[in-house]
Every structure is written in C-alpha cells, then in structure tokens.
C-alpha cells in the first residue's frame, strides 16, 4: 500500500520532493527557450502547497529532457523555476547545483514555507545509470539535503532512477497528491471500470501499445485504433497502406490480438477512410478509403467518417481511456480526427481519461482545457506501463 502525505509530519522539516516538471519547450524566436505547455508544473502545485501549508520547506528534484548526464544549458530548469514562482505566487530559489557543499548550504538555510528547485537531476549521469551502486551513491548525497521524501513525479515512476527509486528508500517517505490521484484513476481503469468501457489508442508506434492492448483486451468492450499505429493493423488485415509508416515486425502480434479480440467479443474499430498526402507535410491532403491507399501516398489522419464512428462509440461508453493522437495534429490539415475524438471524450458523462504525453499536449494545442475531461494523466509511458500490469519502481519504493 502506498503511503499518502498524512503518513508524514512535515512541520519544520525539509522535504525532498520529486516532481515531474518535464515540460515541452519552444524557441521564442530570439534564441530563448520558453515553456509551451505548463500542465506538468500545474500538476505539481497541490502537493507543494500542501507541504508548505503543513509548515515544511521544500527542495524540489526534477528533470527536463534527456541530457544524458551532460550539462546542457538549453535543458536547465531555471525557466521552470520562474514559471513555478509565478504559479505559486511566492519566491522559488534556484540552485545551479544538484549535490555538494554549495547546494547543502542552500538547502539547510531554507526556512519553513520556502522552496528551492535543484538543477536538472539528469545533468548527473548517476541519476539514470544502469549501475545500482552509482545510483545509490547519488541518492545518498541527495538524502543529505532533506529529512523526508515525497514522490510526486508520476511521469517518471516507471524509471529505476536514483531520485525516484533509491532515494525514496533512504528517508521516511510518502506519495504526493498527484501520484495518489493518478494511481486511483488507473486502478479504476484496470480493476473496476463502469461499462461500457472503451479504449481509444493512437500515436505512432504500435509496439509501445501491444502490452496495453493485450492486458486490457479482457476488460474492455470497445477498442478503437487510430494514429500511425493503425497502418500496422491494416497491414495485418492484408490491406494496401501505400507509403504509410508501419512496423513489419509487429504484424504477427497484431493478427493474434485481433483474433483474441474477436474471441472475447471486443468491438474493434479501425478507420474506414483516411486523409493521405504524398509526403509528411501539411500539404495536398486527399481523402481515400482505408483499403485503397495509393502507393505514392501516406496516411496522416483518420477520415471524417471514421472520426464520426469513433465519436459515436465513445458516446456509448461510461468509461473511456484515450492515449495517442489520431493523426499528425501538429499539421492543421491532419488535426480533425484528433479534434473530433477529443470533443466526443469531453462529452462523456462517466469517467474520461486522457493518457498523458502527446494526447495531453494535443488536447491543449487544439483549444481544450483540462477541465473538459474527467482526468488528464501526466504520465505517458508511466500510464501505459501501469495499464500493461507492470510493477513500477517509483511506486514500489513508496510502499
């Protein structure tokens, strides 16, 4: 059983808080990186505020991108510290260090109600090391900075990293409000969904979703497949997919999944029409039947008939989980499938869950707000691995 915040007594203590602040950045045009979606920062606010209200000081540990153990200025968390201070409406100190005497001095100087954000933890190669000893050594250095540990970075709980796994075991620990909420929603999806239960999957790679489909097949009533992964499904049915991306090595597995779905009575929805183009660009869209994609074209979105069919199926459901866009939503010509599915999801009267990563970015980019949906998960890979039935290191460590 994962312990909640009430298990700790943080008054007057320094709390090491592992957050997921891995936000997307974009170039503002003058070479300065700005945050394009602050959803993950906002997701961390309830736990930070709760700890501060309980009289703690908070040292935040987080990562940004994949610097691979090197200091990369474009992946500094300094820009995140500024945005966090705005959202918290209080100062947030930023340390350019991760461990060592300088940051120890900064941490021990914190007073109750103060916040310190450390530099990108992944600038230290030991954070993501495959060597248990290296990770433990870093965790021991980090443990010097606080009295208690709270894990709240749901987007990283599937990683066996020093600040997620080893550090939690060195200090009295608990799960933050975000992790508690994420686990409660995912438990409902895997253990007690209200029916009919629909799962809508998209995104580029079917290999990322095979485990999820396999684990959920005997739990769902409707499975709708869109995004780049749908072409592997069409190929498995022997259909012409033109220049569309697909994973030849997954075709046999997909055939097995389709057979199993049929035996279990799961309604599998595949698109009947596809928006195609001659190249991966926002140009020359044309609409074709899903079984007649020309050899010189590639599929970039589900067509309007398919989107309406998906929306209709979603409207029948009491529980819906969606992960992965229906098309290349970044191109306006190929965003309609994702938009129609998102709109249908926002109208579900039961539980609608948007599963992290690209899906969360897509709904925000298309003008929806978080409140339009029952729940938007902050964890892409973490949500999927949980739904696969895997044990996640960051959750094991919080027991």
Q: Where in this protein do the model-derived segments appear?
A:
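Active-site loop-to-helix "anion-binding N-cap" substructures in soluble metabolic enzymes
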Residues: 1-399
